[in-house]
C-alpha cells in the first residue's frame, strides 16, 4: 500500500480519536486560544527496544505557539516546546537523526552555532528571542530535506 492509501484508510479513525480527546481534555487541536497538543509514538505488536520514536507537541504551529504562551503564561515554555516539536519531527518523520555518533546532528549544529554566537554554554541560557530564532532555523532545515532527497534521487538516476 502506498502512503496516500494508508492515510486515507486511517484518517477517519484519527479524526474521531482526536475529537474524543478534545472532549475529554476540554481543548481543541489547532485552536489558538485553548490548544490540544498530542504525542505520537510508533508502535509494534512485538516490543522492539530502541525503536519507540516519539514526536511530542504535535499541534504546535506559528499561531498556536502564541496561544500556548498566553494560556500557560510562559512564553519560554511555549517556544522551547515548539523548537523541540520541529526537532523531533525532523528526526523521526524526515529521518534527519544522525545514524551514528560520528554523524552531525543538524539541529545540534544549529544550536551550537547560536550558543557560540551568543557566548553561552547551556540550552537553558537561550533567551525567548533565541528560541524563536531556533524555531525559524529549524523550520528552514526541515524544509530543505525534501529538496535534498530529490537531488539525491536525481543523482542516483543519472549514475545508473
Give the positions of each predicted feature:
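N-terminal beta-alpha lobe that positions the nucleotide/phosphoryl donor
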Residues: 1-160
Amino acid at each position: 500500500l502506498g502512503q496516500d492509501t494508508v492515510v486515507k484508510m486511517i484518517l477517519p479513525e484519527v479524526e474521531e480519536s482526536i475529537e474524543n480527546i478534545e472532549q475529554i481534555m476540554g481543548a481543541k487541536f489547532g485552536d489558538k486560544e485553548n490548544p490540544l497538543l498530542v504525542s505520537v509514538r510508533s508502535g509494534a505488536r512485538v516490543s522492539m527496544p530502541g525503536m519507540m520514536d516519539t514526536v511530542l507537541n504535535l499541534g504546535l504551529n506559528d499561531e498556536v505557539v502564541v496561544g500556548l504562551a498566553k494560556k500557560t503564561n510562559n512564553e519560554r515554555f511555549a517556544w522551547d516546546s515548539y523548537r523541540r516539536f520541529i526537532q523531533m519531527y525532523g528526526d523521526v518523520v524526515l529521518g534527519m537523526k544522525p545514524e551514528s555518533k560520528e554523524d552531525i546532528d543538524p539541529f545540534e549544529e544549529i544550536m551550537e552555532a547560536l550558543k557560540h554566537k551568543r557566548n553561552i554554554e547551556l540550552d537553558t541560557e537561550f533567551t525567548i528571542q533565541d528560541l524563536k530564532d531556533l524555531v525559524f532555523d529549524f523550520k528552514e532545515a526541515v524544509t530543505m530535506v525534501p529538496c535534498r532527497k530529490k537531488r539525491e534521487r536525481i543523482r542516483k538516476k543519472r549514475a545508473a
